Amino acid sequence: MKLETEIVNEKQKVLIVSKKSYQFLDYLKKCLKKYSVDVFVSPNNPGNLHIFDYCFFINEVPPLAQLKKSATFFIFFFINKKHLSLSLFKNLKKYKAIKINNENLNHNEVDRILWFIFSQTQEKVLKIDTVSPQLKKNVTLTPFRLKIKKLSTKKNLIILGFSLILLLHFLFIPFLITSSFFTYLSFQALKKEQVESSQSNLDKANKLYLLTKKLYSFSRPTLLFFNLALLPDSFIDIDLSSQQLVNQGIVLLKNGKEIQKIIFQKNKTDEEILELKLRFVKLHQGLKTISDQSLFLAQKINFPLTFFKKFNQQLLDYSDLTGKADKFISYFELVFSAKEPKKYLILFANNMELRPGGGFIGSFGILTTNYFTLDDLKIYDVYDADGQLTAHIAPPKPIEKYLQLPHWFLRDSNFSPDFLEDYNKALFFLDKEMGMTNFSGGMIITTSAIENILSVFGNLYLPDYKEYINDKNFYLKTQLYVEKNFFPGSIQKKVFLSSLIDQIFIKAENISLAKLGLAIKKSLDEKQIVVYLNDDKIQSLIDSSYWSGRVIEPNCSSPQKNCLIDYLFPYDANVGANKANLFINRFFNLKTTVDSQGNINHLFSLSYINSSPGETFPTGYYRNYLQLLLPLNSKIKSITKDGVLVEDSDQKDNLYKTIGFYFEVPPKKTVEIKISYQLGEKLTGDKLYQLIVQKQIGASNSDLVLQFSLAKNVTLTNHNFSPIVKDSEIVYNTSLSTDKIFLMELNKYE
């Protein structure tokens, strides 16, 4: 049986209610019928309005209750109704009204009315002003009007009309550009923390944006019809999102300033503590919003122009930065929200005399906190403690051999590259020397970290010394007032540092909180500050950011993969009792060869350049006890200094294989160290090769070059860095500014 499908087009029904037979109604009906519409005309309201799709009422309004019940679209014509109020229609959703001052409508005016009725415009009222035929006959044209009439040919009017329509459709563009410009100015002012200027420019941008939206609402239907609305839609959304982002930044900055004022107050009231808690909640919300909006904007601003690419990268950086700032503030809040007093050990390490754990410990401080309050920071000279040690503590062999010290003290306690070991050793010495116990955590702050922090404060005036201290002269002034004429037991170091810290606390309320946060984060990322806290929950967060200065255990970062683990950690110990590290530059090169049998051979080269001007203290020879942590199964082939074999070296196996040896770098000389070794594990089949290179606490950033040479039967399928690859040679240049992990998916064919 054959089945047929019959398509039935149901016509729309239109009712026209008019007591008077107006001349324009005939043309109106004719136009409606062109669109397959059934038109019904009645002099009275039939009552059953719900059966019609559209109802036209000419100079008549049915009961409002009847209109509300019906889903019909109502069109009201008001002819010569000068004082009519349209407020009675405010509760109707589906209606439009046409106000006409004369019943003699021409065809163009009827067409205009129909376009208005069936368009998607949000406007509800259309006004039509006409001139009666009688008046037209009596008009006497002046010479000027005659000239206008001559120019007003049909062709000219069409061109003029088209030009005006085109102008109206694109009139929103200059206002959008100006709005975006003021938004950009507001953003730049916010970066400089100029709140008033930022707010002023943002207000101007917002007013122009609202005007742009109004003008664009007229243009959008036409642009949408021609598929041209996507680009202006995107730019308008970008402008709005940018304004919201800047506004949130202003709110965040103001809130941060209030937190800054309260946090340094002592003896806070319950109301102030409650306000501080609420402001921290608001701060977290603001940072989350800014991070999300920055990411959203970066995805929107995906244009090939250089300006947009640069701005896009800035937004991605802000998203990442605010996310990390939120985490950093969470640490701060958790530490300082404890209701009972807490005591923290701060070790000040001079990394110009570099040691495995950061640098020579010249001073230490005890920071006391109590429920959202920084109570006190007391500074001690390290010799205040070491001078009280009566027991003999045997030092590590390099200290005994090269520094020729038979005893071990707090000042040399950080001889491990792992901060937790150094922290526990410092606690041991403080207990033995001064009976200090019950610390809730500790940190090392290097000279470089102090310089980073001082860069935020500008010039700090020390009244006792009549000197201005800043990040540029801090180290030199410290040498002048601390190291000159120093002897164990003198108080000049303690007095100088205490005076400096007092001025830091005094000025802390007025500095840029954002810049301070960035300076601290930079120091944490570059391991110029490392932290350990007894609270496991907080410490796990610190560990996840690699801010704890720990030696990383040899575990595969991807448990699902068949992993081959490689590891390298070089660290120095300046055993020359001078500050030569101020003049030392280091360059690292790791050349790795994977042969056809899967053997992995390394040649690690270290270049040391000593730019010391002479041998006078604090400069001079760089006497270094270099140690390297390598995979436990590594086989050492050779160690050379400037091509000469180093025969005197120390080696021990624990979690890693540790290699250590002594060498010197004279002033104005360069020394090259090379260590050749082979991994005990071979590459077989498909494996994830994982190389971790750790940076020493307190070390300056060093250039690092990685070179990989692969046999023909070994292929690289994926990696997490961007090297230069040519045939089987892979080269990658980077800076060892923090701990690095390099991943490569390798495949060895038999």
Model-derived regions: residue spans:
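Secretory-pathway-linked proteins and extracytosolic
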Residues: P46-L49, K740-E750
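Alpha-helical transmembrane segments and their juxtamembrane interface "caps"
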Residues: K13-L15, V37, I165-L167
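Solvent-exposed, conformationally flexible loop/turn segments
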Residues: Q597, P666-T670, D686, V725-M744
